[in-house]
Structures are given as C-alpha cells and as structure tokens.
Amino acid sequence: MKKLLSILAVFGVSAVGTTSVVACNKTESNNLSRVKTIAAPATVAASTPKAVTKPEIKTALEANVLKAVQGVVKTATAADFQFEVYKNSKGTALETIDLEAGKVEVYLQITPAKDKTVVIGETRYIKVTLPKHGEVTKVDIKDVTVTEQTVGIKASTPKAVKKDELNAVNTYATLAKAVLDAIQNIAPNAGASDFEITNNGAEGDYEAAKEVEVTVKAKNDSANISGQFKFKAKVTATAPTE
C-alpha cells in the first residue's frame, strides 16, 4: 500500500508540475506584452523642430498608443495605462530629438497605470519612426482586415441586378463604417475622404446571397494613407417597397 501511495504521489507531483508549466506559458488576454507594434503619427507638432521635447512626442503618439492597447482590451481607456519614450531599446532616457534634420527612431514601453488592472504586464521596447518635420507619413493599409460583411441592397429586379445597382454595396452604412474603423485602427488621422470602395459584383440574380469581393483603395491625394486591401461581402437584393 505504501508503495502504491508512493507511486501515486510521484505521478501527482509530476501532473502538478506539468500543469504549472502550461499555466506559466499562457499569456493572459489583457497582457500588454501582446502589443507588438504602434503606428507612427502622421506628423509631430513641435514649437522647435530641431529640439522636439518628450511631452511633444508623447502628445503626437497618444492616439496611436491607445489604439494599440485597445487591440488587446477593446474597452481600455487612456486612464488605464501609461507609456514612456526612450532613445533606444535599452531604455536610455530621452529629452529632445531633432526632427528638422530628418526622421528619428524612438522606443516606447507601455505599462499599466497605477492601481489599475484593466491591463497587466508590460510591452517590450517598441520602435516607432517619427516623421521629419514638415513631412507627413502615409500609413500603408495593405494589412488591414475586415470581416465578411452582410449587405442588403434594393434592386428593381432582384433576379437581374444591374451593375449600377451593385454600387450601393460600396456605400452600405455598416460596411463603410467597418472599413473606416479598421483603417483608423492603424491610421487614426484617416477619414472617409481618404479612400474609395469598389466591388467586383457581376450583374445577375441576387435573390439569394451572393459573394462579392470588395476593394478599398487609398486615394492618390490622401495625406494619411496609401495602398489597398480586399475583403468579402455577401450581397442580397430585394425589390423596393412601394
């Protein structure tokens, strides 16, 4: 009996040990270590571009840092965390930088605000390249993703929808909002006027939902974004009610 208990004890310790290892390797969903990138601001407002201060840098970065944190905890607010700006990935203190001469790389670290538990842990030192004074950095939207959208349009004959009727997909309210929200996650300064939405829907029967490909492309004259991305939408047509 003692021998059996000894064997069980050994297995018990082993099982607990294994469980502990798994638990230690698991990253909590609200851990700031999940934040891997922070978008650069389009511009940095500074009273003296040759000696941009840390407070001016932080002001330019605030919106993008909040977006990055909300990518981990959607309900997080600016009061739930704090961040610091450094010269390098070793945490060397920063006082001023020269954005008159050109772009400058800085490093950010985000930690929870004192006595707050909405987020935990901390980020590594995340590199952000600040734009030269007077230049505006466009954000490439090629990696933006939008989940498949469900779209309902009106057509005079749902079994024979015309191309111009399919243009309603591009301005469908929930689809357009999903696109804008997704873009602003990486380019907070972007607006609806910075891009155009098109789709490849072919004329035909849309009484039953049919999949179309939607393309979102930055306008050439946009000061905030560049590039394009695509996603799917399921489109259904119904006749207008009299």
Curated annotation (Swiss-Prot):
Kindly list the GO CC terms recorded for this protein.
Answer: plasma membrane
Question: What does the record note on quaternary structure?
Answer: Seems to occur as dimer, tetramers, and large oligomers of identical chains.
Protein family according to the UniProt entry: Belongs to the spiralin family.
Q: Which organism is it from?
A: Spiroplasma melliferum
Question: Which key words are in the record?
Answer: Cell membrane, Lipoprotein, Membrane, Palmitate, Signal
Q: How does it sit in the membrane?
A: Lipid-anchor
The record, for InterPro entries, names: Lipoprotein_mollicutes-type_CS, Spiralin
What is the protein's known function?
Major membrane protein of spiroplasma.
Q: How far does the signal peptide extend, from start to end residue?
A: 1-23
Covalent lipid attachment of type S-diacylglycerol cysteine occurs at C24
Subcellular localization, per the record?
A: Cell membrane
Pfam assignment, any one: Spiralin
- What top-level branch of life does the organism fall under? Bacteria
Listed as disulfide-bonded, the cysteine pairs are none
The lipid modification N-palmitoyl cysteine is placed on C24
Q: What is this protein called?
A: Spiralin
Record PTM:
Palmitate and stearate are the major lipid components.
